[in-house]
């Protein structure tokens, strides 16, 4: 595969991580650049790791991923989105929110990288070498996630709790989109 093809694949896979990073960036107070880096490292690492797992697993997990992955992604994103909305409406109003604990980051990273697992499986079926695509996918996702977190912070700084609610709705909508795409392909 050419560099351009791998780059475009990386962009496509990184869009979910970008949206989730932007949503997360709206809720973190106080926001530090290290928060954006933490998001970027988690999402970039998972987006790079999942194709490798898919490539190794190949057809063994193919049926599970195709049947249950969209539901898992939907449930994880909907749960975290509802949690964000609840915290925006009823949470501590002192302006300090930090939703970047490792368990939340892990769930978000898994939910946004399940499609990369399927890409890895397709690489295995096609006999495509995995190293170059994985590096490019991870780097593109890192940059997109970092930029998404900064953009989310900038928007959240101006609109406060309204953007937290919007961020939660984005996560729920993203989960719904993943599920709807799966249902349309059945």
From Swiss-Prot:
It is found in: Cell membrane. One of its GO terms (cellular component) is plasma membrane. GO terms for biological process: intracellular manganese ion homeostasis; manganese ion export across plasma membrane. GO terms for molecular function: manganese ion transmembrane transporter activity. The keyword Transmembrane helix applies. Keywords: Cell membrane, Ion transport, Manganese, Membrane, Transmembrane, Transmembrane helix, Transport. It comes from the Archaea. Pfam families: Mntp (PF02659). It is a multi-pass membrane protein. InterPro entries: Mntp/YtaF (IPR003810), Put_MntP (IPR022929). The keyword Ion transport applies. The chain crosses the membrane at residues 1-21, 39-59, 61-81, 102-122, 134-156, 165-185. PANTHER family: MANGANESE EFFLUX PUMP MNTP-RELATED. Probably functions as a manganese efflux pump. Belongs to the MntP (TC 9.B.29) family. This is Putative manganese efflux pump MntP.
């Amino acid at each position: 595969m050419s560099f351009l093809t791998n780059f475009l694949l990386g962009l496509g896979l990184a869009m979910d991580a970008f949206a989730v990073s932007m949503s997360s960036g709206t809720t973190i107070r106080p926001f530090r650049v290290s928060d954006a880096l933490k998001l970027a490292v988690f999402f970039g690492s998972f987006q790079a790791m999942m194709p490798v797992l898919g490539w190794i697993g190949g057809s063994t997990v193919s049926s599970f991923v195709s049947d249950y992955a969209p539901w898992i992604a939907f449930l994880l994103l909907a749960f975290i989105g509802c949690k964000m909305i609840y915290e925006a409406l009823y949470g501590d109003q002192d302006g300090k929110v930090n939703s970047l604990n490792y368990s939340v980051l892990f769930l978000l990273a898994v939910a946004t990288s399940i499609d990369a697992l399927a890409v890895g499986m397709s690489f295995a079926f096609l006999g495509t070498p995995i190293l170059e695509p994985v590096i490019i996918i991870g780097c593109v996702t890192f940059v997109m996630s970092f930029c998404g977190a900064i953009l989310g912070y900038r928007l959240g700084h101006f609109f406060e709790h309204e953007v937290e609610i919007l961020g939660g709705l984005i996560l729920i909508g993203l989960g719904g989109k993943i599920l709807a795409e799966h249902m349309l392909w059945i």
